[in-house]
Amino acid sequence: MNRLFCDTLYFTALVNPKDQWHQSAIEIEPLVESVDLVTTEEVLIELLNFYSEFGKRMRFEVSTFVRKLLLNPKFEIVGRSEISFLDALELYDSRLDKGYSLTDCISMNVCRELNINEILTHDHHFEQEGFKILL
Protein backbone atom coordinates (compact mmCIF):
# COMPACT_ATOMS: atom_id res chain seq x y z
CA MET A 1 0.00 0.00 0.00
CA ASN A 2 1.67 3.19 -1.20
CA ARG A 3 -1.19 5.68 -1.21
CA LEU A 4 -4.55 6.21 0.42
CA PHE A 5 -7.37 8.42 -0.79
CA CYS A 6 -8.79 10.89 1.74
CA ASP A 7 -12.53 11.47 1.48
CA THR A 8 -14.44 14.43 2.88
CA LEU A 9 -15.83 12.32 5.73
CA TYR A 10 -12.30 11.51 6.94
CA PHE A 11 -11.30 15.18 6.97
CA THR A 12 -14.59 16.14 8.64
CA ALA A 13 -13.91 13.62 11.41
CA LEU A 14 -10.29 14.67 11.77
CA VAL A 15 -11.09 18.38 12.11
CA ASN A 16 -14.01 18.13 14.53
CA PRO A 17 -13.40 16.44 17.92
CA LYS A 18 -17.19 16.18 18.35
CA ASP A 19 -17.64 14.18 15.14
CA GLN A 20 -18.77 10.58 15.77
CA TRP A 21 -15.86 9.29 13.64
CA HIS A 22 -13.18 11.52 15.19
CA GLN A 23 -11.70 8.77 17.38
CA SER A 24 -11.47 6.38 14.42
CA ALA A 25 -9.72 9.08 12.38
CA ILE A 26 -7.21 9.61 15.19
CA GLU A 27 -6.61 5.88 15.71
CA ILE A 28 -5.71 5.33 12.07
CA GLU A 29 -3.07 8.09 12.19
CA PRO A 30 -0.06 5.68 12.38
CA LEU A 31 -1.13 4.15 9.06
CA VAL A 32 -1.76 7.57 7.54
CA GLU A 33 1.70 8.79 8.54
CA SER A 34 3.37 5.86 6.75
CA VAL A 35 1.89 6.44 3.27
CA ASP A 36 1.35 9.16 0.72
CA LEU A 37 -2.13 10.64 0.58
CA VAL A 38 -4.35 11.74 -2.29
CA THR A 39 -7.48 13.84 -2.37
CA THR A 40 -9.20 16.16 -4.83
CA GLU A 41 -10.01 19.84 -4.96
CA GLU A 42 -13.68 18.84 -4.91
CA VAL A 43 -13.21 17.04 -1.58
CA LEU A 44 -11.59 20.15 -0.10
CA ILE A 45 -14.40 22.32 -1.46
CA GLU A 46 -16.96 19.95 0.05
CA LEU A 47 -15.13 20.09 3.41
CA LEU A 48 -15.04 23.89 3.45
CA ASN A 49 -18.69 24.08 2.38
CA PHE A 50 -19.73 21.66 5.13
CA TYR A 51 -18.18 23.84 7.84
CA SER A 52 -19.28 27.17 6.35
CA GLU A 53 -22.15 27.56 8.85
CA PHE A 54 -20.21 26.43 11.95
CA GLY A 55 -19.10 29.91 12.98
CA LYS A 56 -15.91 31.95 12.69
CA ARG A 57 -13.71 29.74 14.85
CA MET A 58 -14.48 26.52 12.99
CA ARG A 59 -14.28 28.26 9.60
CA PHE A 60 -10.81 29.50 10.56
CA GLU A 61 -9.73 26.05 11.79
CA VAL A 62 -10.92 24.34 8.61
CA SER A 63 -9.34 26.98 6.39
CA THR A 64 -6.05 26.57 8.26
CA PHE A 65 -6.33 22.78 7.98
CA VAL A 66 -6.83 22.99 4.20
CA ARG A 67 -3.93 25.43 3.79
CA LYS A 68 -1.65 23.00 5.66
CA LEU A 69 -2.75 20.18 3.36
CA LEU A 70 -1.93 22.32 0.33
CA LEU A 71 1.61 22.81 1.64
CA ASN A 72 2.16 19.20 2.76
CA PRO A 73 4.44 17.32 0.33
CA LYS A 74 2.86 13.99 1.38
CA PHE A 75 -0.45 15.11 -0.12
CA GLU A 76 -1.30 14.98 -3.78
CA ILE A 77 -4.32 17.15 -4.50
CA VAL A 78 -5.82 16.30 -7.86
CA GLY A 79 -7.14 19.40 -9.60
CA ARG A 80 -10.40 19.88 -11.40
CA SER A 81 -10.80 19.66 -15.15
CA GLU A 82 -13.63 19.56 -17.64
CA ILE A 83 -12.75 15.96 -18.47
CA SER A 84 -12.84 14.83 -14.82
CA PHE A 85 -16.19 16.56 -14.41
CA LEU A 86 -17.68 14.92 -17.51
CA ASP A 87 -16.27 11.49 -16.60
CA ALA A 88 -17.78 11.82 -13.13
CA LEU A 89 -21.09 12.87 -14.62
CA GLU A 90 -21.03 9.66 -16.69
CA LEU A 91 -20.55 7.58 -13.52
CA TYR A 92 -23.24 9.60 -11.74
CA ASP A 93 -25.67 8.96 -14.62
CA SER A 94 -24.85 5.25 -14.68
CA ARG A 95 -25.64 4.86 -10.97
CA LEU A 96 -28.98 6.63 -10.71
CA ASP A 97 -30.17 3.97 -8.24
CA LYS A 98 -27.38 4.96 -5.81
CA GLY A 99 -27.01 8.01 -3.59
CA TYR A 100 -23.58 8.97 -4.94
CA SER A 101 -22.70 12.64 -4.92
CA LEU A 102 -20.83 14.06 -7.89
CA THR A 103 -17.84 14.53 -5.57
CA ASP A 104 -17.99 10.80 -4.75
CA CYS A 105 -17.99 10.00 -8.46
CA ILE A 106 -14.98 12.26 -9.09
CA SER A 107 -13.17 10.63 -6.15
CA MET A 108 -13.95 7.11 -7.36
CA ASN A 109 -12.68 7.92 -10.85
CA VAL A 110 -9.47 9.43 -9.46
CA CYS A 111 -8.92 6.33 -7.31
CA ARG A 112 -9.37 4.07 -10.32
CA GLU A 113 -7.01 6.18 -12.44
CA LEU A 114 -4.33 6.14 -9.72
CA ASN A 115 -4.86 2.49 -8.73
CA ILE A 116 -5.88 3.39 -5.18
CA ASN A 117 -8.11 0.79 -3.53
CA GLU A 118 -8.23 1.96 0.09
CA ILE A 119 -10.20 5.01 1.11
CA LEU A 120 -10.10 6.94 4.37
CA THR A 121 -13.85 7.24 4.83
CA HIS A 122 -16.87 5.58 6.35
CA ASP A 123 -18.96 6.25 3.22
CA HIS A 124 -20.29 2.87 2.09
CA HIS A 125 -20.78 4.15 -1.45
CA PHE A 126 -17.09 3.41 -1.96
CA GLU A 127 -17.62 -0.20 -0.87
CA GLN A 128 -20.43 -0.50 -3.40
CA GLU A 129 -17.84 0.30 -6.08
CA GLY A 130 -15.35 -2.28 -4.78
CA PHE A 131 -13.09 -0.07 -2.66
CA LYS A 132 -12.02 -0.86 0.90
CA ILE A 133 -13.04 1.77 3.45
CA LEU A 134 -10.80 2.28 6.46
CA LEU A 135 -12.98 4.06 9.04
Stretches with model-predicted labels:
Residues M1, M108-N109, E113-L135:
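Acidic, PIN/NYN-like endoribonuclease modules and their adjacent C-terminal/linker elements
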Residues M1-T39, F54-T64:
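Short, well-structured N-terminal submotif of metal-dependent ribonuclease cores
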Residues F11, L44, F126-E127:
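A generic structural signal for short hydrophobic patches within well-formed alpha-helices
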Residues F50-K74, V78:
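Helix-adjacent hinge/juxtasegments
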Residues F75-N117:
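Active-site neighborhoods of divalent-metal-dependent phosphate/nucleic-acid chemistry enzymes
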